[in-house]
Each structure stands twice: as structure tokens, then as C-alpha cells.
A protein has these predicted regions:
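A short acidic-Thr-Gly-centered motif at the start of a beta-strand
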Residues: 2-11, 36, 60-63, 126-129, ...
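Divalent metal-coordination and catalytic microenvironments
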Residues: 20, 48, 63, 73-74, ...
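Active-site environment of divalent metal-dependent phosphoester hydrolases
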Residues: 22-26, 51-54, 77-80, 128, ...
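Active-site neighborhood of divalent metal-dependent phosphoester bond hydrolases
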Residues: 56-129, 156-157, 161-164
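Short, surface-exposed, charged loop/turn segments at secondary-structure junctions
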Residues: 85-87, 139-156
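Active-site-adjacent alpha/beta core region of enzyme catalytic domains
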Residues: 118-148
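Conserved beta-sheet core of the metallophosphoesterase superfamily
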Residues: 151-204
Length: 204
């Protein structure tokens, strides 16, 4: 199951980043209950809130009703590519559906994904800079400035980011999901992974 990263400073609300929910609405509710979330807490979702799990529609509804910030993940990118300007892209669908998109479509039932929801997915930011914490779904290209990057890097990058030996920022920590932590050397299932200037919380 997905994990979280939380930061608490004196006399300030908790900042809680939640990793790839992937349609697991019941697990999300359990995590929120376990953390004893209060209205003052600031929750941030790192993308990939849809696909694979059986309740993507419920996850999206829950996040939207509470107006929590949510980042673009590679699975949201696949959804949007499949719904290309309102028209279904058959080639993109053949890639998205086996990657968990079939479960997302099923969760929306006969009504399907509305244009309002497509607009919401489209509006998701690629990253959030919270000062000393930088939230992004997959990572950053260590050899490019932020303004030289797009969702190809922010939502999909893996080895190039994780294998870099130097922190991208000197004054903030990058928090990501996307890469399952126990696929990295020396990390056991359920553990977070850390590297130079980054923390990966996708500890399935």
C-alpha cells in the first residue's frame, strides 16, 4: 500500500504528502484515520491517484471535495492522452488500459469520466514547491533546470534521477512517489527510500 511523508514545524499545521493511491479508496480512508487528519493539516497527493485499484472514481471525488492539492502522475498523463481533446485515442488506450486504466473506467460506470473531471486532471500541476520541500511525482532531470523540463521528466523519470550522486537542490528535499522503494538497493518492503536530496515514499 502507498505511504506518506509528513513534516511538522512548531506552531504550524502538518504537511502530509501521500504517495500513489492508485484507486485504493479504502486504503486511503484507513491511512487518513490512522493519521488522525484534522482540518488544519495540509494534505498533498503526489499523483497516480487512479488506475489499478477498484475505486479510482471515489478517490478522485474525495480529493476534489476537500480541495486537496494533487500532482500530475504518469497515470493521469496516460488517461489524458487516451482522451485526446475529447476523442478517444485508440493507440493510447491500448497502452493505458492494461496499465490499470480498465479499472479506472470500470469505477466510473456507465456515465464514464465527465468533461469536468477531464478538466480537473488537465489542471493538475507538475510539481509543488513548499519552500524546504519540493513535491513531484517521479523526480527531476538532474542535468536540466526546471524550466527546461516537462511531464516527460516530472511524471516518468526514474533511473536518471535516482542514480544521480548530487542533490538537485541545496536548500530543499525532493519528495516523490512513482518508483516502488523496495526495487532500490538495500530497501525492504514498507520502507521509504532516501538519496542525495530526495525521499521516495512509494513503499508498496
Amino acid at each position: 500500500m502507498f505511504n506518506l511523508f509528513q513534516k511538522k514545524s512548531d506552531n504550524s499545521p502538518r504537511q502530509i504528502a501521500i504517495g500513489d493511491v492508485h484507486g485504493h479508496y479504502d486504503g486511503l480512508c484507513q491511512l487518513v484515520d490512522f493519521c488522525q487528519i484534522v482540518p488544519e493539516d495540509r494534505l498533498y497527493f503526489l499523483g497516480d491517484v487512479i488506475d489499478r485499484g477498484p475505486k479510482s472514481a471515489e478517490v478522485v471525488k474525495w480529493i476534489r471535495e476537500r480541495n486537496y492539492p494533487c500532482l500530475m502522475g504518469n497515470h493521469e498523463v496516460m488517461l489524458l492522452t487516451s482522451f485526446n481533446n475529447g476523442d478517444l485515442d485508440e493507440m493510447a488506450l491500448r497502452h493505458w488500459l492494461p496499465s490499470g486504466g480498465d479499472a479506472t473506467l470500470e469505477s466510473y460506470g456507465d456515465e464514464g469520466i465527465s468533461q469536468d473531471e477531464i478538466d480537473w486532471f488537465t489542471s493538475l500541476p507538475s510539481y509543488l514547491d513548499l519552500g524546504d520541500v519540493f513535491l513531484v511525482h517521479a523526480g527531476v532531470d538532474p542535468f536540466r533546470s526546471l524550466d527546461q523540463q516537462n511531464n516527460d521528466q516530472f511524471c516518468w523519470i526514474r533511473e536518471k534521477f535516482l542514480s544521480n550522486h548530487f542533490p538537485y537542490f541545496t536548500d530543499k528535499t525532493i519528495v516523490t512517489g512513482h518508483t516502488i522503494t523496495f526495487t532500490l538497493p538495500g530497501v525492504r518492503p514498507g520502507e521509504l527510500a532516501q538519496g542525495p536530496g530526495w525521499i521516495d515514499i512509494e513503499s508498496v
